[in-house]
């Protein structure tokens, strides 16, 4: 049954083929020499293998052995031709399969070249090695960047150290370390840094005031003048930030005012200027003011006075509670150690509130300046900053004049007590001197 089906399929296949010449032999195929024993035919294509087999068989067939008078022999020959064609097809398929590994190796080489790279000596690197080399290059690049940043940081620190040394010398020459704080070693590191930063801030403030004065004299537009005014406002914000840092590190250095000039310390209120007094001084300098501006400035002055009074009362209560904590209990030499420790712990807890009061005072000063900026025009605000800067400059100049006054006459007459007549003359001269007040 299987043979008949194969015969039927081959007959159908032969029906579709065109007629061929009867050149096939009648003897069995076992007498034919198979040409596929050569290794070169295996590597060839299917069409070339089929052509070589056909030519070899054509050379072996003799024309005298053909029989054309029998239809059965013709069918056998056609079946034989189908068998040979099938053989040739299988032979070409085997050759294709044999050549497949070489093609796969070639494709693998292409994939390796795709995912790898070639070194200078011509050797091919795989993807893992290339990735490791890329990671090493990236790590080396980051290391160089860190080294460069470290060198720049060292250079910046060296320059900053030189600036601090120069500012220390300038501070010593100006007498900024009087009294018990005659040397920076007697102060905390935060106090020394604030003194240096405050000296730098004064220098920058002088430059800012000079720029603002030049802008007003040149009659610059409000846009350009407003940029300079905003820069001055940021300059004061920087000062308040420095004071906040000092309050958190050494509030006693801030409240004593040793960073300020001697004449400035006479007018300090909670380690700074009193906002209501500054507003009272600035209002006459701003004529003419509109009615709305005048009402705004007076309202700001009144609210500042109320806040100042509240802060002063709170600070007084803190001082009283601190004195009660320190002076509580017996003060003799035989005091109880446990009682002493408890009193000191209570005093330390209340002393921590001292920082908040000075922070609130600085917040009041900062808010007063910003609120004044919203009330006034750009040119009026510029004149306010100039007035504040000139006022502080005069106080510092007065301190320098007082420190550099001649003292020989005072030393010569230090041990001489005045007589009655001389005392009357001194009293009369003092009355004439202060008669204007």
Swiss-Prot record:
Subcellular localization: Nucleus
Residue stretches making up the bZIP domain: 126-170
Disulfide bond residue pairs: none
Segments for region (Disordered): 33-75
Chain positions covered by the region annotation Basic motif: 128-148
Location of the region described as Leucine-zipper in the Swiss-Prot/TrEMBL record: 154-168
Record domain DOG1: where: 191-405
Chief location category: nucleus
Keyword Metal-binding among record annotations: no
GO molecular function, one term: sequence-specific DNA binding
Family label: Belongs to the bZIP family.
UniProt protein name: Transcription factor TGAL5
Organism the protein comes from: Oryza sativa subsp. japonica
